Design a protein with these regions (language model features):
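Hydrophobic membrane-insertion alpha-helices, especially the h-region
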Residues: 9-22, 463-473
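N-terminal membrane topogenic signal
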Residues: 2-10
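Membrane-interface amphipathic/re-entrant loop segments adjacent to transmembrane helices
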Residues: 142-157, 161, 201, 362-378, ...
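Non-globular, low-confidence helical/coil segments that flank catalytic cores
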Residues: 48, 92-94, 98-107, 124, ...
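Membrane-interfacial loop-to-helix junctions in multi-pass transporters
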Residues: 172-176, 241-248, 382
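Hydrophobic alpha-helical transmembrane segments in multi-pass membrane proteins
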Residues: 134, 187, 193-372, 437-481
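Membrane-interface helix/helix-cap signal primarily in integral membrane proteins
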Residues: 8, 15-16, 20-206, 532
Length: 552
């Protein structure tokens, strides 16, 4: 019998990894990004559009590759990627398409977090292999050619657009078209921001992002359709049938992963399904922690920076929570009737997934839905029906039956969105809580200790869990008191007033982006407040309950 190592070594190794990641976070986050310093000033730059433009209220957001920069007497060749924010001057402005070569006059800005605890958009862009973001008006942008983009993601995006048009041809329109395209194809560019917020507040944001839920639905449908081939055969033929069936299933699943853009969550799900199918052919155990670890290793081998992707972290933490906690939660509620077992499974899986993703969700979004159980009891079966109807509509788009299916999709998606909006408007639908990396580490350790207590039934793990949660609460109280000392940000004319505690400081604003430092660690980007910039400042202040006294 193989030697069994005490579980405490696994606990200590995990704790060491968490602490190491916590300390490694700071050098990465605070190190000076010296790359592309020559892009800080406005220059004429030639760029290549890599992906379809994303519609925004101000115009379009483009993912581009910087090709060259024109200086006074020379041309500098570039190779970095960036985001290009294109503001349309007129309603008839020409929209660049994938593959277009543009000539723009702009500068690349590397954003910084405005206040302590704010989302660091500049760090996010670096993790997406982008040096920054450039702002340009459509009148300052000229198309000078087109070079087709031949990357795998570009081909996937083009395939997505063709399938979205099939939905439109079948009769889907408006918000229903955007919603169905999001949950079946992963095309979320046309989703309204208010709808995204509604699903997040109701605890159903996972439905909008194609992930293991949607991949599992497609997998179940494909298996159901293919398993009627052949009946019980002798052993050799049975093995051959298993191999052929698995090959067909995996071919379809990887094609679906390609269509949805090869996001980390879909890759994780399809990789796990691949391992499951291989195990089924070899008659081995299917889903386990080893399967999840193998999928994570393959994803990180392909792209190490995906470790810092929110999608990657949410996907793997949700599955980890389900694998660890669901067996024990199910044992607390034995259910024999099918209907009762369905309700139990939805509840236990939802609780386990929320528990697994809680540290990540609080760190990035600062909120958690209180009524996620009420939401998932309705949303999960509705999502199954929507995905099945959506795939059937794509297949039968130009037939009478396809038109009927599209009408059913339109009705069901509209009803589901209204239900989610109703959940959002219930009293106390969300719990707002901003956490620091230290508090995230406390939450992870608390979840790990809870699992060890359930598994080992030893009081020491419960005591450790209570101590860790006490540390979490102390840290939260300290941060709340510190935040209370820095509340008000006001602008009057060209003077910025900043209140921290009982004192008020004032700073003159320049006619450009200005960098300010308050106290020891808080940073603010302020700008000369007039016109559209003042509207942007208003939106920012309203979102964070910051007061603008007067603007002249």
């Amino acid at each position: 019998m193989a030697r069994s190592y005490p579980f405490v070594f696994i606990f200590l190794a995990t704790a060491l990894c968490i602490v190491s990641a916590y300390y490694l976070h700071f050098p990465f986050n605070l190190c000076a990004d010296t790359e592309a310093d020559y892009l800080d000033s406005a220059r004429v730059i030639r760029v290549h559009v890599l992906e379809p433009p994303v519609s925004k209220p101000y115009g379009y957001m483009l993912s581009v590759r910087l090709l060259s920069m024109y200086e006074a007497d020379s041309v500098r060749l570039l190779s970095q990627q960036a985001l290009l924010r294109l503001e349309t001057d007129t309603a008839h402005a020409v929209v660049p398409q994938t593959g277009d070569i543009l000539l723009v006059r702009t500068r690349v800005v590397r954003p910084h977090a405005l206040f302590k605890g704010d989302f660091d958009y500049g760090r996010y862009l670096r993790l997406q292999h982008k040096v920054g973001i450039a702002y340009v008006r459509s009148s300052q942008c000229r198309t000078i050619g087109n070079v087709p983009v031949r990357t795998l993601r570009a081909k996937a995006a083009a395939c997505q657009q063709r399938l979205v048009r099939r939905y439109a041809d079948a009769g889907l329109f408006g918000s229903a078209l955007a919603f169905v395209s999001a949950i079946t194809l992963g095309e979320k560019d046309e989703l309204d921001s208010s709808l995204r917020q509604s699903f997040a507040a109701a605890g159903a944001a996972h439905v909008l992002a194609v992930s293991g839920l949607h991949t599992g639905i497609i997998y179940a449908v494909v298996v159901a359709l293919l398993t009627f081939f052949g009946r019980r055969r002798p052993l050799y033929e049975q093995r051959l049938r298993r191999a052929l069936l698995s090959a067909a299933i995996l071919l379809i699943m990887w094609a679906y992963a390609f269509v949805t853009g090869l996001s980390p969550s879909v890759l994780r799900a399809v990789l796990m399904l691949t391992i499951v199918q291989v195990g089924w052919v070899l008659r081995r155990q299917a889903i386990s922690l080893n399967t999840l670890a193998a999928a994570a290793c393959i994803c990180l081998f392909a792209d190490p920076l995906s470790l810092f992707s929110v999608s990657f972290q949410l996907s793997f933490s949700a599955v980890l929570g389900i694998l660890l906690f669901v067996p024990y939660l199910n044992s607390l509620w034995p259910a024999e009737r099918k209907s009762v077992r369905y309700v139990r499974d939805v509840i236990t899986v939802s609780i386990a997934a929320v528990a697994g993703t809680l540290p990540v969700t609080l760190y990035y979004y600062g909120q958690v839905a209180r009524y996620f159980l009420l939401t998932n009891l309705v949303v999960l079966p509705a999502a199954f029906v929507l995905v099945v109807l959506g795939i059937a509509t794509l297949v039968l788009a130009h037939t009478l039956l396809g038109t009927w299916l599209a009408a059913a999709l339109q009705l069901l998606s509209t009803w589901l969105c209204r239900y989610v909006e109703w959940i959002e408007h219930l009293s106390g639908a969300t719990l707002q809580l901003t956490v620091t990396p230290w508090m995230v580490m406390c939450l992870v350790l608390c979840l790990l200790c809870s699992y060890l207590f359930i598994r080992k039934r030893r009081l020491v793990w419960a005591i450790v869990c209570v101590v860790v949660m006490a540390g979490f609460c102390v840290s939260h109280v300290y941060d709340a008191r510190e935040a209370a000392q820095q509340q008000t940000f006001a602008v009057r004319g060209r003077v910025l007033y900043y209140k921290h505690g009982e004192s008020i400081d004032s700073y003159k604003l320049e006619n450009k982006f200005t960098f300010f430092r308050f106290g020891e660690t808080d940073y603010v980007y302020a700008l000369y407040v007039s016109g559209k910039k003042y509207k942007a400042l208003q939106d920012y202040c309203a979102e964070r309950q910051i007061t603008i006294v007067e603007n002249r």
